[in-house]
Amino acid sequence: MRPIRLAYRDRDRLPVIECIREMARRHYDVDVVVVRIEPTDEYEAALFDDRCDLIVEHLEYLYARAAVHSETEATMFCAPVDRTGVELMALPAVKDASELRGKTVAVRSSGRPDSLYMRLKAAGLDPSDTVLVPDRDVGRWNQWKKVVSGECAAVFMSPLHMASAEAAGLRVLPLPDLPMIGNYGHACLTRFATENDALMEDYVRAVVHAICLIKYRPAEALEVVLAAPTTQEGDDAAELERRIGIIAQTLLTTPFPSGEAIANTHAVAIAEDPASAGVDPRTLWSARWVERLEGSGFIAGLVAELSADG
């Protein structure tokens, strides 16, 4: 099989990664070598230090790098999620997001807080009425504790991690999401893409196959994840099943972002590093493999096959 090295940071990505790996092995003669790279500075250097061929999350830093080096150095090519993917939660006494004006919203300091500031602003709320809460202060994704304590009126939570918040009495408060490059966005070096065009196309086939498996055959996806080498002893099957169900709702079978999602993500990158403003974000994106698969009928055929009743 042809090897390709895929780097990630966050274990929350593993259900999708492991389905990609297994679909690539079963159907497309591709050996996806999964590598976890931490901390963030090492992860950001990995593409350029030849520690991986692809990355599967956290693409924003590539815009600032492109402004300094070259807009053609890296290629972003796949985006299975087109929104921020987190929910606003509050106690039941808060019925509408408009009631949060002048009140404090807790925001996890990790990830992309600027994307959440954009959502608040779009909803007519003041992004300055927020407080960044690092995991080290409350535990991973336990920012909801700031609402229970009365320090904050609401909190942004990942659906993967909101069970404890719901148990504490918090409920989802509707707030429009924004088009955004969400979880599982992919990038590689442009040179690698050019030199390995057929491999890249087959890798994207595996991505689409994994997406369809998760969306339409979740029981089979769960079997893949439970058998995966990265699944740790003691991982709860019911919890993994719940997570696969949540992830399935977010995935696009044609995994390429809209122009608005690209623009909004670029705005986040600029907020994180103003150097990113010197780059046209469209120059870093290539739709060629997704377009080939869509144009050939591959995606529609796979959707029809896997969504059919077994």
Mark where each language-model region is.
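Conserved C-terminal helix/tail region of periplasmic/extracytoplasmic solute-binding proteins
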Residues: 270-310
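Short glycine-centered helix-capping/turn motifs at secondary-structure transition points
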Residues: 21-24, 50, 150, 169, ...
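Short, glycine-/small- and polar/acidic-enriched structural segments
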Residues: 2-132, 153-157, 173, 178-180
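Pocket-lining segment of extracytoplasmic ligand-binding domains
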Residues: 142-231
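Secondary-structure end/capping motifs
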Residues: 196-277
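Short, hydrophobic alpha-helical packing/hinge segments within bilobed ligand-binding/sensory domains
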Residues: 42-46, 140-146, 162, 243
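Residues within well-ordered alpha helices
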Residues: 22-26, 119, 164, 224, ...
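Cytosol/matrix-facing juxtamembrane amphipathic
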Residues: 135-138
